[in-house]
Amino acid sequence: MAKMRVRLPMLILLLGVVFLLAASIGIAYGEKDFTKNPPKEREEEEHEPRQQPRPRQQEEQEREHRREEKHDGEPSRGRSQSEESQEEEHERRREHHREREQEQQPRPQRRQEEEEEEEEWQPRRQRPQSRREEREEREQEQGSSSGSQRGSGDERRQHRERRVHREEREQEQDSRSDSRRQRNPYHFSSNRFQTYYRNRNGQIRVLERFNQRTNRLENLQNYRIIEFQSKPNTLILPKHSDADFILVVLNGRATITIVNPDKRQVYNLEQGDALRLPAGTTSYILNPDDNQNLRVAKLAIPINNPGKLYDFYPSTTKDQQSYFSGFSKNTLEATFNTRYEEIERVLLGDDELQENEKQRRGQEQSHQDEGVIVRVSKKQIQELRKHAQSSSGEGKPSESGPFNLRSNKPIYSNKFGNFYEITPDINPQFQDLNISLTFTEINEGALLLPHYNSKAIFIVVVDEGEGNYELVGIRDQQRQQDEQEEEYEQGEEEVRRYSDKLSKGDVFIIPAGHPLSINASSNLRLLGFGINANENQRNFLAGSEDNVIKQLDREVKELTFPGSIEDVERLIKNQQQSYFANAQPQQQQQREKEGRRGRRGPISSILNALY
């Protein structure tokens, strides 16, 4: 029994030794197999497609990398200091090789420029957080070398799409900001004109429809403003339109020829001359000046369609076709009693026939090649102006000829400005159109006093100068028609002020009944077309003459205004000027006081400076 007790511990010890030996042999065999081909890597090789051969240097790096992963995956056996130092050394080598590969990797110049351009919208690539992510990223970079062109194309396409979206967002923001700035539906800046025609000799521009932005101007939907400009010694070719015109010469000189079935009328026009051109009348305008450009403003009243007008030219140029080309061959042959080939050569301008004719005449360029506005010679100008008449002088305008807006005395005038007006009862040309013409001159630093028109709606064109204007409207009307707009004055809930700066080429509207004042920061010239002008009355709200507030009964003034009747009377009579006044009287008085102080002499000036 005692022997059994001794042998039992020895047997257990032997079994333990055998178990340890077996475990050691198994671990060693597993390490050897794992080093040759790790299971995880075998699975990846079975599932992943065969890749292109990799550089030897990279294979060595990956072999070192797998060896380090093996040590990381083993049971905690404890590492020696030498193994840790070797691992750090391998890590430094891998980092060095990785940097060298990135430096040597070729990248197209276009790709670099796109990456620099895409910095705003593409996030920076982050450093991998683990060795596996680092290895996968390196393999993706190597695998993407074959499809770099495709990838760069996708990136360019994505970049273009994002850039387009960004531009659309910017345009939307700009339009919103423009809509916020453009709270005044009665003001049209000069850039609201659309170019109808342009060549090297001149241009024709048309202002957008007045009711395009707001329904407050529906009564003006059948009126359009057109601006015509031409260089010296040029002619706009003959045409007729399905609209009545009132044209005014703003700058330069012109000779206009009006052709009727039984006669031809020729007029010389100067600055300020106006003329009605009936619908369907064939006409052509010449700029005979050698140095000065011609600038004409026209009010168009279309006949067929509200707000739409069409020009019809008998000639064919590179910009438009002749209305003869709309007829059939048989109709043209019967109309001109000749063969169609002759009609095509002479009137319609067949390209091949024109080229032959040009070579026969030895001309480098015909008038048809220039377009609607063509250059003319000195001899042609003399012939066109031979029988021209001038505009009527002072007195009542003629029934058909031109007249000058400033030929008669101004109806309002003082040292600060002048106001001229031609009403339908004075000018028979405008009676059936129910339109008046005004021309206003406001000197620099002057103010056209607040006033309103009883019936007429005025379309005003800024001919020259700069300034600003203020127009008063009613809040209820504005809220019904545009509820999204905010009030300018939170404290004044009954009225709204529309104000804008004025510059050359701008157009603004003065609705009937809306009080208005205009301030000139430089000499300001304004051309006005009054719509529904019959029996219109202009009522001033300040000044010594034509002041409707001044005409109120004394008792009514006391009931109307919060101040005492004495203060109201004194305030109304305080403005000694009529129609036009100084825009900054208080500042002028201050300057006059300072000027009187300056005349005290040098002693007083020195004392004032010291004390």
Swiss-Prot record:
Chain intervals with Acidic residues compositional bias: 483-492
Q: What's the name of its gene? A: BETA1
Q: What further note is attached to this protein's record?
A: The variability of the residues taking part of IgE-binding epitopes might be responsible of the difference in cross-reactivity among legumes.
Ranges of compositional bias, category Low complexity = 142-151, 390-402, 580-589
Q: Would you tell me the protein name for this molecule?
A: Conglutin beta 1
> Region Disordered: start and end of each range?
32-194, 384-407, 476-495, 580-600
Tell me the lineage of the source organism: Eukaryota, Viridiplantae, Streptophyta, Embryophyta, Tracheophyta
Quaternary organization: Component of globulins complexes which accumulate in seeds.
Where are the annotated glycans? N434, N519
Q: Which residues form the Cupin type-1 domain?
A: 186-344, 403-569
Native source organism of the sequence: Lupinus angustifolius (Narrow-leaved blue lupine)
Keyword annotations of the record: Allergen, Glycoprotein, Seed storage protein, Signal, Storage protein
What's the family? Belongs to the 7S seed storage protein family.
Please name the InterPro entries in this protein's record: Cupin_1, RmlC-like_jellyroll, RmlC_Cupin_sf, Seed_Storage-Functional
Q: Which GO terms describe its molecular function?
A: nutrient reservoir activity
Q: What CDD domains does the database record attribute to this sequence?
A: cupin_7S_vicilin-like_C, cupin_7S_vicilin-like_N
